Amino acid sequence: MLYFENDYCEGAHPAILQKLTETNFEKVSGYGTDPYCASAREKIRAACACPEADVQFISGGTQSNVIVIASMLQRWQGVVAAATGHVAGHEAGAIEYTGHKVITLPQHNGKLDAAELRALVATFYADDNHDHMVFPGMVYISHPTEYGTLYTKAELEALHAVCQEYKMPLFLDGARLGYGLAAEGTDVTLADLARLTDVFYIGGTKVGALCGEAVVFPHGAPAHFMTMVKQQGALLAKGRLLGIQFDVLFTDGLYFSISKNAIATANRLKAGFAAKGYRFFMDSPTNQIFLVLENTQLAALEGKAKFGFWEKFDDTHTVVRIATSWATRMDEVEALIDLM
């Protein structure tokens, strides 16, 4: 069986496992106050060119989204997201569970449009009844998006400008951030994210770690953020588990080098599929490939290759997601191309 269902099929990079083993019997303080977390924070600040940033480690992506959003919104506010945003469709109502509405806008290749965002907020405040409505209090985007697409620096600057104008924090979900930064042709860097967002996170779960995300607040975390992490059940007593992993990932550029493997293998797959005449549902420059397959083709591949179901295209076709990762081998890629 060839596994291309997602980018978290594998465990962790061997260097992380080695460091976890080497440090296993060291006695350190808990809850993220250990020296490994401190070292990882400094390395992340340096990578972001943001020495004053507050860096917090959280166990997973949905936990990060819920806690960040809940910590930065007032009770009468909601968060604006693309209709295809992860918080809008694939987190089981986790944001709504905290009492905050997800206010959706149309997606454009998975992205929010700054002009539409400005129009939404301007229309809200122009309504004489807006005190009876959920206030747009924050903006959520992801990079890469659910479709593997990327924002340009200009697009981020435009969103940033709207958020500044209306005093709304801009939050960037970076569950797959490594793959976005490694993509060919991107003009967005970690330093840009530190400059243009109020909070973003660096995904580890999908980029080489066993688990964990590094949440970066360029201008400081909200008051009592750690307490909210604890309250939501996402504060690990053995915080070293996350600190060690990110310390390794941000040593000698490992996070960025392993991300490039996902891009290289995805590009080879795309070239192979294109040569065979396959239809692409979306042009993604990152590690996620979306193909439109005939249902009969999909049935024939069952038991031979594992893909992620995305959506029904029509009565006879299905959109599937094929994902590469930091660990995908080129021989697996060639085997899939041959199989297809």
Where are these regions (language model features)?
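Conserved PLP-anchoring active-site segment centered on the Schiff-base-forming lysine
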Residues: 71-89, 118
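Conserved C-terminal alpha-helix-loop-beta "cap" of PLP-dependent enzymes
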Residues: 74-76, 267-268, 272-340
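Catalytic PLP-binding core of fold-type I/II PLP enzymes
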Residues: 151-183
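PLP-dependent aminotransferase-class I/II
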Residues: 99-144, 151-158
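Active-site C-terminal subdomain of aminotransferase-like
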Residues: 108, 135-136, 142, 150, ...
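Hydrophobic beta-strand scaffold residues
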Residues: 102-103, 170-172, 280, 307
